[in-house]
UniProtKB/Swiss-Prot annotation:
It catalyses: ATP + H2O + 4 H(+)(in) = ADP + phosphate + 5 H(+)(out). It is a peripheral membrane protein. Its EC number is 7.1.2.2. The gene is atpA. F-type ATPases have 2 components, CF(1) - the catalytic core - and CF(0) - the membrane proton channel. CF(1) has five subunits: alpha(3), beta(3), gamma(1), delta(1), epsilon(1). CF(0) has three main subunits: a(1), b(2) and c(9-12). The alpha and beta chains form an alternating ring which encloses part of the gamma chain. CF(1) is attached to CF(0) by a central stalk formed by the gamma and epsilon chains, while a peripheral stalk is formed by the delta and b chains. This is ATP synthase subunit alpha. The lineage of its organism: Bacteria, Pseudomonadati, Rhodothermota, Rhodothermia, Rhodothermales. Belongs to the ATPase alpha/beta chains family. ATP binds at G174, D175, R176, Q177, T178, G179, K180, T181. Keywords: ATP synthesis, ATP-binding, Cell inner membrane, Cell membrane, CF(1), Hydrogen ion transport, Ion transport, Membrane, Nucleotide-binding, Translocase, Transport. One of its GO terms (molecular function) is proton-transporting ATP synthase activity, rotational mechanism. It is found in: Cell inner membrane.
């Protein structure tokens, strides 16, 4: 046979070799068709196997959505992204993935949307992300511990009378423009010292601020305030502003809880501020009505209570026993090898009332879900009392056990003293003849109110709060003019810092108020009160002398 002839066995080998590496690639997916779309929702036909909360993609429009309604012959989907891009007849595909957000440490200091995409122009969020589902079951009873560790807000009125513990849910409620966001930002700023070495302020607290339906300018202001005060580096801001699609406003609080749970389940403490849940409820009402769910009271859907309860129940103090913590119900697979016990998630939800009506539908719902409320009142705010906390209507149902012993000792009568002052103040307006004991109560009440006044961005360490409240409760400010109380407080605390730093450090470290510390507070407060009282007498003498000269 000549060299140019074809050998069948060689041809067979070549074909076998070539065809052996050949693989067929067929993409299999379940597709459906958009029946109608608009206002942030789409109704799809053909996705009969879709699951609740599953992500659906619209490949031609590069838009994603989440399944919210499962009906007999169609599926209701809420749309994330460019909601106007989806129209009737478009193709939609199942992804098989539940709506999730990728979380890692590099999110701290960033502003993101509820799907984890950066909004601050600082580039992508680097590093490997742990993908966690937006919806997740709350930890069961056996995976929780009692709330016993304080979360210091740095706000005297709260830490002394309405204490918040790590793992608690404390509602901040009030009309618009009463300082609700200021309470949240001050609390976040006060956690800065937990990240500084050598401050003995407890374990670091990682913060998440969730803005729902806020103006973009408001969110930008919060970001600037946190950055200016050195608190942004331990905070994640989740922004679903009023200009964003309604579905993103609905899922934003779940995304915030998700990020907080990442820190909680890895053995750390986290704080999530929801500002505010009233707007989330409005967003959910809008979506429910568009999806033709039957409306109930105030046109909210029947499961509006469950919306907030399942969100806020995710706040918890997790059991310290690591072996038990790893068995936690609903734990995502992505966290399985990272779980550590002893973490906590504290929630500070905000509800905006209309004309002070706390008996409306959403306020009463959230009050019944949370472990207490901080009620901010318009009249107090307008009269110059900041923060404008109405002590009579505010309560902390579990935080008391988390309050440090030193604060319990000095502030045990503070709430009742203020309540009696408010009552007497109302009666005193009707008559001028008051007996000495009533006048003395009014005088002290005025000074207590003044002591609890506090400028924004000026959190007070708990040991200094103990010192100044001790002086006020024990009558050392009774003879100090009300106008001089602020100066007295500054000088008093400055003197303690300079001359008795060891006493303040001891209170911070031991959380106890010793007899020696009380003696120091008594001595310093009495000396300064005498000076201020003498100054007042001299001023009165000068006024009398001037009047005599004029006569």
């Amino acid at each position: 046979m000549s060299n140019g002839s074809i050998r069948p066995d060689e041809v067979t080998d070549i074909l076998r070799r070539e065809l052996g590496d050949f693989e067929t690639e067929a993409e299999e997916y379940e597709a459906g068709t958009v029946l109608e779309a608009g206002d942030g929702i789409a109704t799809l036909y053909g996705l009969s196997n879709a699951q609740a909360s599953e992500l659906v993609e619209f490949p031609e429009q590069d838009v994603e959505g989440m399944v919210l309604n499962l009906e007999e012959d169609n599926v209701g989907v809420i749309l994330f992204g460019d909601v106007d891009a989806v129209s009737e007849g478009d193709e939609a595909r199942r992804t098989g993935r539940i709506a999730s957000v990728g979380v890692n440490e590099n999110m701290l200091g960033r502003v993101i949307d509820p799907l984890g995409r950066p909004l601050d122009g600082k580039g992508p969020i680097e590093g490997e992300k742990t993908v966690l589902p937006l919806e997740r079951k709350a930890p069961g009873v056996i995976y929780r511990e009692p709330v016993e560790e304080p979360l210091q807000t740095g706000i005297k009125a709260i830490d002394s009378m309405i204490p918040v513990g790590r793992g608690q849910r404390e509602l901040v409620i009030g009309d618009r423009q009463t300082g609700k966001t200021a309470v949240l930002t001050d609390t976040i700023i006060n956690q800065k010292k937990t990240h500084q070495e050598g401050t003995d302020s407890g374990d670091p607290v990682y913060c998440v601020y969730v803005a729902v339906g806020q103006k973009d300018s408001t969110v930008a202001q919060v970001q600037r305030d946190l950055e200016r005060n050195g608190a942004l580096e331990h905070t994640v801001i989740v922004n679903a502003s009023a200009s964003m699609p309604t579905p993103l406003q609905y899922v934003a609080p779940f995304a915030g809880a998700c990020i907080g749970e990442y820190f909680r389940d890895t053995g750390r403490d986290s704080l999530v501020c929801f500002d505010d849940l009233s707007k989330q409820a409005v967003a959910y009402r809008e979506l429910s009505l568009l999806l033709r769910r039957p409306p109930g009271r105030e046109a909210y859907p029947g499961d509006i209570f469950y919306l907030h309860s399942r969100l806020l129940e995710r706040a918890a103090k997790i059991i310290s026993d690591e072996e038990v913590a790893t068995q936690m119900n609903g734990l995502p697979d992505a966290l399985q090898d990272k779980v550590q016990g002893g973490g906590s998630l504290t929630a500070l939800p905000v509800i905006e009332t209309q004309a002070g009506d706390v008996s409306a539908y959403i306020p009463t719902n959230v009050i019944s879900i949370t472990d207490g409320q901080i009620y901010l009142e318009t009249d107090l705010f307008n009269s110059g009392i900041r923060p404008a906390i109405d002590v009579g209507n505010s309560v902390s149902r579990v935080g008391g056990s988390a309050q440090i012993d030193a604060m319990k000792d000095v502030a045990s009568t503070l709430r009742i003293d203020l309540s009696q002052y408010r009552e007497l103040e109302a009666f005193a307006k009707f008559g001028s003849d008051l007996d000495p004991s009533t006048q003395q109560q009014l005088n002290r009440g005025e000074r207590l109110v003044e002591i609890l006044n506090q400028d924004q961005f000026s959190p007070v360490p708990v040991e200094e709060q103990v010192a100044i409240i001790y002086a006020a409760i024990n009558g050392h400010l009774d003879d100090v003019p009300v106008d001089d109380i602020e100066d007295f407080e500054e000088e008093y605390l400055e003197r303690l810092r300079l001359r008795h730093e060891d006493v303040l450090t001891e209170i911070r470290e031991t959380e106890e108020l010793t007899d020696a510390a009380e003696e120091v507070f008594e001595e310093v407060a009495a000396d300064m009160a005498d000076v201020y009282a003498e100054d007042e007498e001299e001023e009165e003498e000068d006024v009398l002398a001037d009047e005599g000269a004029t006569a």
